[in-house]
Amino acid sequence: MDDAPRLVFYFDYVDPGSYLMHRQLGQLLPDGVEATVHPLEVRPVPQELIDGMDPDWTAYGRTVEGLAREAEIRMAHPTFVPWSRKAHELRLHAAEQGLESPMHAEIFSAHFQEGADIGRIDILVAAAERVGLDASESKAVLDVDKHRDRVVDL
């Protein structure tokens, strides 16, 4: 049994606070403490998408952006907030291929640095290719909802 301390981090790829935590996690963890990440959809399908211009959402984003600036982390405030289930599914696929960490970082970067719509399969497949995953296999995995239940159940 592994007795190493473990931090469990629930996150969503469209949540500004999750992005900031992702960027700072390595620096914040004491030696010997590992982090486990679990998907948590802010707005799961079929709920309405978050209105990226909603005053409460915008205020939250601006607060996180201020904290990011203090930490010298560049961060955009995307005005479109897509559903994120497919992005979570792609991370789980990447984990099976030994590429979870780079895929996790790439998805966050695509949304919060490039402003990409990470709810689109073509955008996610391009991100998968950038980290070394096979495009056809990644698209097939996303098309058939292979990891849907794992995202919903986690």
Q: Where do the PLM segments sit?
A:
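C-terminal cap of thioredoxin/glutaredoxin-like
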Residues: 2-33, 37, 106-154
